[in-house]
Amino acid sequence: MDSWNMKGSKMVDVNEITKYLPGFNCGACGYKRCDLFAEALLNKDVKLEDCPFLLRERFKENYEKLKEILKIKGKIKKEEKYIGVIDGYEADFLLKPLPNECSCRETLLIMDKKELKVGDYIRYRPLGCPIPHFAKIIDEYHGFYIIHVVGPSHRITGEKIEYKDVGIAIVVAFEGIVEGKVPEVGKTVKFIPKHCMMQKVHSGVVVQVEGKRVYIEGIDLKVF
């Protein structure tokens, strides 16, 4: 669906351009991904013809559509800024849960020797965070636990759930959907998990990207 500003003028953003590109992320245009090429098109740093696939018969309609879109001048949609509430730092993007999930997936290193299994509910405090968390274990992998944060909202609803207290845990990874510009693999990024109670900026290194789905390791709350 096309976007319009308050005066009825058409808005153009990276997503509108990207959906008409071939989507091969082949790098032939000089950019690693099609969305990066789309951004360069909007900034007029490249030409459509720099993508060799757009010149093929298969993508003829896409090529013509993109030419029409790129005729719109001076209406490029500005990227939204994501600012942490606690420290006021600017994040690169907001990290949202995977479809039909209640929170981003987090991978924990739990030092407590309690016997834990998938389906258990745990109470813990992430290293460096002053707020106790409540979570459900959804998977286990080589001594790491993948969880969904589910509380402390249960204290408001009055829901009675038995939790195992495991003390301090180290958050080693996040997985979720990017709202904003998708980062490249290997980049150090600053992000805000949408479910974070403090809305604090986190940092980490992107190790996997699939569309807008990203996996980030080396999580740290110290951001400069």
Curated annotation (Swiss-Prot):
Residue stretches making up the 4Fe-4S domain: 9-68
Chain sites annotated for binding [4Fe-4S] cluster: 26, 29, 34, 51
InterPro entries: 4Fe-4S_dom, ACDS_complex_subunit, Dihydropteroate_synth-like_sf
GO molecular function: 4 iron, 4 sulfur cluster binding; metal ion binding
Signal sequence residues: none
Keywords per UniProt: 4Fe-4S, Iron, Iron-sulfur, Metal-binding
Cofactor(s) demanded: [4Fe-4S] cluster
Keyword check for Nuclease: no
Keyword rRNA-binding attributed: no
Cofactor note: Binds 1 [4Fe-4S] cluster.
One Pfam family from the record: FeS
PANTHER family, alphabetized: ACETYL-COA DECARBONYLASE_SYNTHASE COMPLEX SUBUNIT GAMMA, PTHR36214
Name the UniProt record assigns to this protein: Uncharacterized protein MJ0119
